[in-house]
A protein has these predicted regions:
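Positively charged, low-complexity intrinsically disordered leader regions
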Residues: 1-37
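A short, aliphatic-rich alpha-helical micro-motif
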Residues: 15, 157-158, 203-204
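Conserved N-terminal subdomain of the carbohydrate kinase-like
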Residues: 20, 28-162, 323-335
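Structural motif
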Residues: 21-23, 132, 161-164, 193, ...
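Active-site metal-binding loops of divalent metal-dependent hydrolases
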Residues: 26, 168, 284
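Short acidic, glycine-rich surface-loop motifs adjacent to enzyme active sites
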Residues: 159-172
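Conserved phosphate/ATP/ADP-binding segment of small-molecule kinases
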Residues: 170-264
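Conserved post-catalytic alpha-helical subdomain immediately downstream of the catalytic base
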Residues: 244, 270-332
């Protein structure tokens, strides 16, 4: 479809205005790199000579990082972490990314979610991930921790223009936390956007959600093979969630926006040839889409901006972010 380029640019320029709260499963990605030396005598495994370790914000933390890069740090996070060494890595990464974590709840019975990826390389090859180690507590929050988080939400939500619920199903977003977040946000007339992988019908009376195609199929209970199926799926999610719009991300096939009153828009993908790593691209879409909605864009223009942002971050390895200047440059090159 045709887009008004001037309108699109005006929305992008306003992405630095809204203040956002990200509620969900906060995590860090620990990226360990080494050069391959030889096969160990102890076991049939590689011996790596360690070269560096990078700490990157992941899961809901990555969504917050994407917001911070675009709006100059007008972002809060609310979630739960442990009281361990990894907690310091998480808060240190928040400090570096200019993310406010004053509403973070510490629970010494839980682990701070950390995903350690160990990668090796030799001089004649690209870096190859060898193993991933997950350190997390997947049980639901205790009643005490849940109550503390909800109290923090009561303080945080009035401060912001929009709320992102980022559910990686690691235990933070209990049924009560979800319901209270939406209830408080609706009371203060705040935008609520959901990024979840399953149980999509749990999120009712929201502004929008951004499921990918496989998660949409699981939720609606049928395979999506064409645009007719996409329309049926979008309509079902609208009914189930009572949302104002649904944005389904379709990978190489772009995006599909369903709005109330049977309004549908298909948005093509803008970058098929330079895809190096899709890790965290969904977080980028959700973050940019939410910022654009809060900046006054409708669902279609917000999705278009999110799509452009995704086309930029997939050119980079690992969880990546983009900037307003990069988005504006991309608009000139794409449209």
């Amino acid at each position: 479809m045709d887009f008004d380029k001037k309108k699109l640019i005006s929305y992008i320029k306003r992405l630095n205005e809204p203040k956002i709260l990200v509620v969900g499963d906060l995590a860090i990605d620990e990226m360990m790199y080494g050069d391959t030396e030889r096969i160990s005598r102890e076991a049939p495994v590689l011996i790596l000579q360690h070269t560096r370790t990078d700490i990157i914000l992941g899961a809901a933390s990555n969504a917050a990082h994407n917001v911070s890069t675009l709006n100059g740090g007008k972002v809060l996070v609310a979630g739960v972490c442990g009281d361990d060494y990894q907690t310091g890595l998480l808060t240190g990464a928040f400090d570096k990314a200019n993310i406010d974590y004053k509403y973070l709840v510490k629970d010494n019975t839980r682990k701070t979610t950390t995903k350690t990826r160990i990668s090796g390389s030799i001089s004649t090859s690209i870096t190859q991930q060898i193993v991933r180690i997950d350190r997390q507590t997947k049980e639901e929050l205790s009643k005490e921790t849940e109550a503390l988080l909800i109290e923090n939400l009561k303080k945080a939500i009035p401060e912001v223009d929009a709320v992102i619920l980022s559910d990686y199903h690691i235990g933070t977003l209990t049924k009560k936390v979800i319901e209270k977040t939406i209830e408080i946000a609706n009371k203060y007339k705040k935008i609520v956007v959901v990024d979840a992988q399953k149980n999509l019908e749990t999120y009712k009376n929201i502004t929008s959600m951004t499921p990918n195609l496989p998660d949409t199929q699981k939720s609606v209970g049928f395979f999506i093979n064409n645009d007719v199926d996409l329309k049926k799926a979008g309509d079902k999610l609208l009914r189930d969630t009572k949302a104002k719009s649904i944005l389904i991300t379709c990978g190489a096939d772009g995006m599909f926006v369903t709005e109330q009153n049977k309004k549908y828009t298909k948005i093509p993908v803008f970058n098929k040839s330079e895809v190096f790593d899709v890790t965290g691209a969904g977080d980028t879409v959700t973050a940019v889409y939410t910022l654009a909605l809060a900046a006054g864009a409708d669902s279609v223009y917000a999705a278009l901006i999110g799509n452009i942002a995704a086309s930029l971050v997939v050119k980079q390895f690992g969880c990546a972010t983009t900037t307003i200047s990069e988005l504006l440059c991309a608009v000139e090159n794409i449209l």
